[in-house]
C-alpha cells in the first residue's frame, strides 16, 4: 500500500506540474514560461527525492508542447510577413474559414510581440533596450536619490532630455526590471535598502527551523522571482506588487514547515 501511495504521489506531482507548464505555454507569456522552466531545472538538480516526477514533467511537457505546435491549427494557419525587434514587430498573415458553411479561406494581418531572437539580436533598438537605456540615464543623472519614486513615466513624458531617449516607442509606465527600477527612481540609497531586504529575507528562510526541502523550495522561489536578468512588473503598482509580497509571505511560512512522520 505504501509503495502504491508513493507511485500515486509522483504521478499526481508530474501531472500537476505538466498541467501548469502547458497552461503557461498556452498563455503566450514567454517570461513566465522561462522562469517556470528555470524553477523545474533547479528543483531537479537539488531535490534528489523528487527528480523522477520532475523528469517525467519535463519529458511529458516537451512531448505535449511539440505535438500541440505540430498539430493545432493555431500554430500552423499563418505565415510570417515581417519580423523585427520593435514592439508589435512580428507581422503575420492569419488564415481562417470565411464562414462555417464554406471552404473559402480568408486572411487578415495580425501584429504580435517580436520574437525573442530578434529582440536579443537588436536589443538596443528594441522596446526593452530603449527603456533600460532611459532608466540608466536617469540613474546616472541622479545616482544617490534617483528621480523620485513613481516619477519615471512623468519625466519621460515631460523632460526633453529623457523624452528624446525614446526614439521608437511611447514612454513606459516603469522600467520593466525591479533592480533598474529602484536605481532609476530611488538611486543607490533605495537600491541598497532593497538589496539588504532581500539578504535579510534569504537569511530568514535559511535559518528557519523547518525541513531543508521546504527551505530550499522557498529559496528557489525567491531566487526566481528576483532573478535580475528578466523583465518584470513594478513592485509599487497594482497586482504585481500584491502577488509578489503575498508569495514572499507564503515562502516565509513554508520555510518553517515540518513534515509529520
Q: Model-found features: residue ranges?
A:
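Membrane-interface transmembrane helices that cradle and orient dolichyl/undecaprenyl
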Residues: 1-12, 254-261
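Transmembrane alpha-helix segments characteristic
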Residues: 11-23, 213-228
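Helix-loop-helix junctions and helix-breaking kinks within/between transmembrane helices
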Residues: 14-52, 67-76, 187-188, 234
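Membrane-interface catalytic loops of GT-C/OST-like multi-pass glycosylation enzymes that act
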Residues: 25-35, 172-177, 230-243
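Transmembrane alpha-helices of multi-pass inner-membrane enzymes
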Residues: 40-41, 197, 218-230, 234-261
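Hydrophobic transmembrane alpha-helices and their immediate junctions
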Residues: 41, 45, 50-51, 162, ...
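Long extracytoplasmic/lumenal interhelical loops at the membrane interface
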Residues: 107, 112-141, 145-186
Amino acid at each position: 500500500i505504501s509503495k502504491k501511495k508513493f507511485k500515486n504521489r509522483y504521478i499526481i506531482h508530474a501531472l500537476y506540474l505538466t498541467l501548469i507548464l502547458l497552461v503557461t505555454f498556452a498563455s503566450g507569456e514567454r517570461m513566465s514560461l522561462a522562469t517556470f522552466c528555470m524553477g523545474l531545472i533547479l528543483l531537479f538538480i537539488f531535490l534528489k527525492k523528487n527528480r523522477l516526477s520532475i523528469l517525467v514533467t519535463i519529458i511529458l511537457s516537451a512531448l505535449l508542447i511539440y505535438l500541440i505546435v505540430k498539430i493545432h491549427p493555431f500554430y500552423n494557419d499563418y505565415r510570417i510577413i515581417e519580423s523585427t525587434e520593435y514592439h508589435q514587430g512580428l507581422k503575420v498573415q492569419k488564415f481562417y474559414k470565411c464562414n462555417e458553411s464554406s471552404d473559402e479561406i480568408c486572411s487578415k494581418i495580425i501584429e504580435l510581440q517580436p520574437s525573442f531572437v530578434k529582440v536579443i539580436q537588436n536589443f538596443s533598438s528594441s522596446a526593452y533596450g530603449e527603456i533600460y537605456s532611459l532608466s540608466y540615464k536617469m540613474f546616472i543623472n541622479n545616482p544617490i536619490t534617483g528621480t523620485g519614486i513613481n516619477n519615471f513615466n512623468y519625466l519621460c513624458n515631460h523632460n526633453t532630455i529623457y523624452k528624446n531617449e525614446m526614439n521608437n516607442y511611447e514612454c513606459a509606465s516603469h522600467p520593466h526590471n525591479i533592480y533598474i527600477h529602484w536605481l532609476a527612481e530611488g538611486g543607490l540609497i533605495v537600491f541598497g535598502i532593497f538589496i539588504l531586504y532581500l539578504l535579510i529575507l534569504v537569511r530568514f528562510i535559511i535559518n528557519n527551523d523547518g525541513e531543508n526541502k521546504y527551505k530550499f523550495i522557498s529559496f528557489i522561489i525567491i531566487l526566481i522571482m528576483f532573478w535580475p536578468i528578466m523583465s518584470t512588473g513594478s513592485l509599487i503598482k497594482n497586482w504585481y506588487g500584491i502577488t509578489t509580497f503575498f508569495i514572499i509571505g507564503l515562502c516565509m511560512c513554508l520555510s518553517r514547515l515540518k513534515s509529520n512522520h
